[in-house]
Amino acid sequence: RRAFDNGNIGYDELKKVEDETITELVSKLKELGYHVITDGEFRRATWYLDFMWALDGVGHKPTKTGLPFHGEDAIVDDTYLVGKLKLSGEHPFVDHFRFVKQFEDENTVAKQTIPSPAQFLAQFLFPFNLESTFAQYESEEAFIDDVVEVYNEFIRQLYDAGCRNLQLDDCTWGMFTNKSGSILFGTTKEGTVEVQKKYKGVNNRVIDAAPDDLVVTTHVCRGNYHSTYISSGPYDAVADVLLGEENVSAFFLEFDDERSGGFEPLAKVPEDKKVVLGLVTTKRPELEDK
């Protein structure tokens, strides 16, 4: 990908490498007995921004500062609004999904991952992006309405392509668990719960509008850039709103070290929802002893 970005190879060569590595990945997933297959997000520069860059109204450029992770700045493009949000034509992730779907069989289903609506909202409502966002929108409500419409249209496209398993990746809740999380969201500690409800609300508007036979789950973590993290804190601070009120079918929750706290907040998860515990870390090469 770096060679492509530097102009040393063309898109066809990049896509050939992507196709080959994704095919190899899916083969390994099947060999190991996994019933859900993905493309490993191998076609993306970042796990979340590529989705946004494909939309009308979103601009980006190389960053001069990065985002402050623990011990390292995450060097990802500055991403901001330059116009009203709209999905014109087919989103490129839909074709990415089609490539994986061809490998489905009686034992496997293809899953698509995207940043959650809350993650999208956070990107453009963080303090450093407020000026550009409200240069395009007269109110937060109008912006949120367009976010919901863009997601609804994307999900329609994805569903029509045969997707029945969608995962919303969401680091906003991990940031809410941080002691200084309120600063990131431009509020006070006392105002954090209302902000959480706003982010939960935009997620639920999109989830509730999805087709009934589309399984929608969410993955929550505290950031991962070169195995560093952006926040720390237990799920207690978000248990009521996220675990108790978000309308997903299942939660995939990071629990791979002491930064995640204990399991007590899981008591807030309704009985009709599933929880998958992320106990095995991807951040260190050492294998767990049990």
Across the structure, where does each feature detected by a protein language model lie?
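Domain-level signal for soluble alpha/beta catalytic cores
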Residues: R1-K290
